[in-house]
Amino acid sequence: DKEKVAALPEEVERVHGQVDGLINNAGIIQPFKRLLDLDEAAMERVMRVNFWGTLHMTRAFLPRLLKRPEAHLVNVSSMGAFVPVPGQALYGASKAAVMLLTEALWAELQGTPVRVTLVLPGAMRTGIAEEAGGEAPRAEGAKVPVLEPEVAAKRLLDAVERDAFRVLLGRDAQTMDLLYRLSPALAARIVQRRMAHLLT
């Protein structure tokens, strides 16, 4: 709700006195369906929560952050922003938009008190798939450790402490990031082969 978001900074300042940081961590996935099988409402909801929610929260709080001696903006994207997952075209697009938005803000805010960190998590135990009406997806033939939220939160805070530009959470995210840099087509093919069963 854009209007409620616009009113949020004043409410937070009234309760807490000041805002020194913002972590945009809202995210939902789409049902595991091909693009042409998705209805408009599902597509719009994914973009509204994942991208527009992050954008509106950032625009609402950034003026306050810029007035602080030091402040930090953290946007949580996803490994799905750079590695395409079958049945998650809209989710990937929304998180790719968050990734590029965050990288652009990092550049725009150089020379200001606001530091910016981009977070790219891999598989985490969050219940996001169950919220979308399905089971947690598992890659065929893969034993990928799932990151616990508490571990991810600690690593995120460590990244903020050292003013990291970009942090990959989880061994899967780190591996796929390296592979994607070496060969985007190969990385996409590996994910497609291991995740294609989700669409059958």
Region spans (language model):
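Active-site loop immediately N-terminal to the catalytic Tyr-X3-Lys motif
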Residues: 36, 85-89
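SDR active-site lid
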Residues: 107-171, 189
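Active-site helix of classical SDR
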Residues: 58, 94
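The beta1-alpha1 cofactor-binding region of Rossmann-like NAD(H)/NADP(H)-dependent oxidoreductases
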Residues: 1-7, 40
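Residue(s) in the substrate-gating loop at a strand-loop-helix junction
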Residues: 78
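Substrate-binding pocket helix/loop in short-chain dehydrogenase/reductase
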Residues: 33-35, 42-44
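A glycine-rich helix->loop->beta "capping" turn
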Residues: 11-22, 31
